[in-house]
Amino acid sequence: MKKLLNTLYLTQDNFYLTRERDNIVIKQEGKVINRFPYRIIDGIVCFSYLGASPSLIELCAENQINLSFHTPQGRFCGRFVGATNGNVLLRRQQYRLADAEMSIEYAQRFILAKISNSRKYLLRFKRDHRERIDTHLFEEVNTELTWAMEQVQLAEDKNSLLGIEGQAANQYFRIFNDFVLNDKETFQFNGRTRRPPLDCVNALLSFGYSLLTYECQSALEAVGLDSYVGFFHTDRPGRASLALDLVEEFRAFIVDRFVFSLINKGQITKKDFEFKENGSVFLSEKGRATFLELWQKRKHMEVEHPYTKEKVKMMLLPYVQAQLLAKAIRGELESYPPFMI
């Protein structure tokens, strides 16, 4: 089990990372802003264009500290990792399964978990806020998601599965405006938009999914899997397809719940966004800092894992699933148990 230490988030776009002996040093315009012993850091997420010194990159690589770079708006650019953990036999088996008919079984499990967890969030929200939502719409979407779960298990190929997943996602998005209980004008949701996000809700979702993808990619590589070879998401240069597969299980449970909690508690407001002339919307520097501060706290919340029945900190969940996936690929488990609440 990977120990959860601390992830260092650099939110200002003029920060520069360097190294002084055993310390990670943050500089701004040549002035030292802060320093941290590398032993207490397990990951660095940088939203800066300035980058990092070769000595800092070497320190991270030698000590398995994941270092990822994002644009100030949160779009993932790239990452540095040290020597690959795990053994070549695991990856060879992963590649065989990804190219074989069995890949559909893994893909089905990722998507079944995605739809199931979306449905569970819907039902929980309906239970807690019955007086403030369109219960008829919720029941209608619940029926559609239940049907989609049945169809996922009957899908015979990835194209069929892709169609079912897309229909289920569209149904789920129909109720997003009902998830907003505070400042509905600012947080009006008009459908999922990416690159760029075109409203405040999409800006929050995209930022959260980017962070979650980083966590999932780190988890997969920590157990020795190739995060770029997936089962549901097809291979594409530069795309961490297996990380995106794993993200599907956690979208609703980790990111969606968190985003609507921020909105409904008034922890993120209109002033935390930047509205561009082309219609795109991004979190401001202050908005990113608020999001990340609360995200970091959320990571330490404990939940009971549905398969192991043990208490697990929230952001250790991708590591547990990565371990279970590796066991399934090795043949130590009869099948992969996805994260389903």
Task: Go through each PLM region and give its residues.
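A surface-exposed, charged beta-strand/loop segment in the N-terminal or early-internal portion
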Residues: S48-K120
